[in-house]
Amino acid sequence: MANLNDSAVTNGTLHNPKTQQGKRQSTGCVKNGISKEAQQNRKAYAEDKPVFEPYQEAPLYVYVLTYMGYGIGILFGYLRDFMRNWGIEKCNAAVEREEQKDFVPLYQDFENFYKRNLYMRIRDSWSHTVCSAPEPYMNVMEKVTDDYNWTFRHTGKVIENIINMASYNYLGLAGKYDDSMVRVKDTLEKYGVGVASTRNEMGTLDIHKELEDLMAEFLNVEAVMSFGMGFATNAMNIPVFVGKGCLILSDEFNHTSVILGSRLSGAVIRPFKHNNAENLEKLLREAIIRGQPGTGRAWKKILIVVEGVYSMEGSIVNLAQIVALKKKYKAYLYIDEAHSIGCTGPTGRGVRELFGLDPEDIDVYMGTFTKSFSGSGGYIGGKKEIVDYLRMQSHSTTYATSMSPVVAAQLIRSLKITMGYEGNIGGMERIQQLKENIKYFRRRLKEMGFIIYGNDFSPVIPVLLYMPAKVSAFSRFLLKKKISVVVVGFPATSLPEGRARFSMSSAHTREMLDTVLEVVDELGDLLNVKYFPLKKSGRAILYNKEGFDNEASFEEMHSEPEA
């Protein structure tokens, strides 16, 4: 343990008094975080009290009606396919050529059928064209269709001042140019927009190194490697860590980028039930006892892959128990903090900080710069030898163009604001405001009678709508009321669990939230999607009290805020 007398507390984390540039800070400094006295007086927990992340189920009739709706849609879909085959109705869908009928099908049968006959009916709920910065208010171009959603055209009109509940602007750092972006402008003048090379050739700039050093300080790890694309950070780098003869234990709700990267690795993949430590331990025990299929040899590596905040569920990984299992069975842990870094934990350092765990408990930190930090790209952090190996072996460093220096400058700006080094409104104020917005919005939705998934610390708030017709109606109605929200359905979710997903931001004012809640309340009555009273399922997520960084975090997890 570092000596507090020789170190400074910066943004709630113990750091050496020497900064990145080698300059000393005063040993008593407090930057946007927790004082040394608070660190010294932090209470240890004597009890092991469980905390539940409630999972609520709709009444049975809702599932019955949802499947009936799909059944009717499928029947009409077959009827329309019959009419298309006989030329009665024009077919706008992509089809196989007759001479290639004996080839491997280009489209999976049901997914192609679903897209052609069901998704196409509600396709107007997605892919809107935004023509402004993703600020709390934004502008969207109006679109119409002349062929039942097969194609769209813009009318030339712009829908202005839409309340933005769809963008991942968690800390409110995305926006038009202001005085804090002077360095971004200077970087553009000095470096230009593009790098025109890969990281392993001529594409590593000093500003990339500065960004990576700052991110390593923020994460409290030895080294960080940055990448130009968040999706590729998972897809192209998981194969670097595991390959044939290795086992990946992946949460069933992990992101598509994790799934793709796992498949590309050649490792054996076994999903475990969402956030279920008991099921994960069962798979770990079986893997160690039985070994590799066919030969029974021991696995070269066992890699557990989880997310910090699950973007479709709004749930937070049960990290304390996952880490305990990782240590018990000598596995490795890879965590994707795309939706948790910057906005979760007392100082925004993610779920590791929220649970009060040691930074070395996690082997590979992955995250994106697109959410809290309002840029683009991703990063992987950890021990220096891991990151150095990644620099040499990753397809993203060998073949992909480096991150734009302008984006790197924006990310440095965002990180410094989050860490309290710059900005009129520091990271702690933004994180606290985001936390208050999340708790207020979730509480009000629950009081109205909606089914809400996820955790009270999650900036993602899913509202369950179930029926696909209600999913599209929800989106269309809100857009008419100048509110934007993401709606999600199959295959991004299970077939019956269509939902709306509200993304919270510290930039949302209470007046904005009240406006949205008033409209959503009216819409909930209109669509009959207030399913209270509800029956709680046994699928609860269990947390240990000792896993939290401080008592306030634990108490807030399972206490209702005051009105």
Curated annotation (Swiss-Prot):
E.C. no: 2.3.1.50
One Pfam assignment: Aminotran_1_2
Entry comment describing in which tissues the protein is expressed: Expressed in white and brown adipose tissues.
Alphabetized GO MF terms: pyridoxal phosphate binding; serine C-palmitoyltransferase activity
Cellular compartment(s): Endoplasmic reticulum membrane
Region (Disordered): 1-32
Keywords annotated in UniProt: Acyltransferase, Endoplasmic reticulum, Lipid metabolism, Membrane, Pyridoxal phosphate, Sphingolipid metabolism, Transferase, Transmembrane, Transmembrane helix
Disulfide bonds: none
Topological type in the membrane: Single-pass membrane protein
Cofactor(s) of this protein: pyridoxal 5'-phosphate
Residues with PTM N6-(pyridoxal phosphate)lysine: K371
Biological or metabolic pathway of the protein: Lipid metabolism; sphingolipid metabolism
Catalytic activity field: L-serine + hexadecanoyl-CoA + H(+) = 3-oxosphinganine + CO2 + CoA; dodecanoyl-CoA + L-serine + H(+) = 3-oxotetradecasphinganine + CO2 + CoA; tetradecanoyl-CoA + L-serine + H(+) = 3-oxohexadecasphinganine + CO2 + CoA; octadecanoyl-CoA + L-serine + H(+) = 3-oxoeicosasphinganine + CO2 + CoA
Subunit structure: Component of the serine palmitoyltransferase (SPT) complex, which is composed of SPTLC1, SPTLC2 or SPTLC3 and SPTSSA or SPTSSB. The heterodimer consisting of SPTLC1 and SPTLC2/SPTLC3 forms the catalytic core of the enzyme, while SPTSSA or SPTSSB subunits determine substrate specificity. SPT also interacts with ORMDL proteins, especially ORMDL3, which negatively regulate SPT activity in the presence of ceramides.
Name of the protein this chain belongs to: Serine palmitoyltransferase 3
Gene: Sptlc3
